[in-house]
Amino acid sequence: XXTKFDFFTLALQXPAXF
């Protein structure tokens, strides 16, 4: 989705992407 939680998970999975 596009929720804040999703963004948080992405950052945790790949900090480089953050």
Curated annotation (Swiss-Prot):
Keywords: Antimicrobial, Fungicide. Leaves. The keyword Manganese does not apply. GO terms for biological process: defense response to fungus; killing of cells of another organism. Thermostable. The keyword Metal-binding does not apply. Resistant to heat and proteolysis. Has antifungal activity against the plant fungal pathogens G.graminis, P.infestans, P.megasperma and S.sclerotiorum. Does not have antifungal activity against the human pathogen C.albicans. Does not have ribonuclease activity. This is 30 kDa antifungal protein. It comes from Engelmannia peristenia.
